[in-house]
Regions:
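N-terminal non-cleavable signal-anchor helices
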Residues: 32, 147-148
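Donor-binding and catalytic core of enzymes assembling or modifying cell-surface/extracellular glycoconjugates
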Residues: 1-88
Length: 148
């Protein structure tokens, strides 16, 4: 299982839990649909909702898990806790979600980070240690802290 699938497997097994998947491109939507069919309590919203509908759904969530991406900022707009995963970029570069707790960022401190301002460059180390070092257990632990 991929890291994302390991996190979904763990979280979706909880009673009284609903996990909503948000996404964009055609390849991503296909994967999210497959995950929604495979894991219990998982619903893919990718490509199905307007932005206003997404914001309304997010406003009722206990937490949002995101990469450094647009959904982090949307969740921040509706003032819900966001657990954000950072790889090549860094929240100190000014891209953190509005009014979000720095304690809810998951990142590996490496001297090569940030390797680019907006994450568009390839890893010069060739190992993507900034993301590979983040484990499903780290993510689940952060989510548990937020929702407990």
């Amino acid at each position: 299982l991929s890291k994302q699938e390991q996190i979904l497997k763990h979280l979706s097994a909880r009673d009284h839990t609903k996990i909503f998947l948000f996404g964009g491109g055609k390849k991503e939507i296909k994967v999210l649909e497959e995950w929604a069919q495979h894991f219990p309590n998982v619903i893919s919203t990718a490509g199905k909702l307007t932005i206003n509908m997404e914001l309304a759904l997010m406003s009722n969530m206990d937490v949002m898990l995101v990469m450094d991406a647009a959904n982090m900022h949307l969740a921040s707009l509706v003032n819900i806790p966001v657990v954000s995963i950072w790889g090549a970029t860094h929240p100190c570069a000014g891209f953190a979600g509005w009014n979000q707790s720095a304690a809810n960022t998951i990142q590996i401190d490496l001297p090569c980070r940030p390797c680019s301002l907006s994450g568009e460059k390839h890893c010069y180390r060739k190992d993507y240690a900034c993301l590979q070092g983040i484990t499903p257990e780290m993510v689940i632990e952060h989510i548990n802290k937020v929702i407990s």
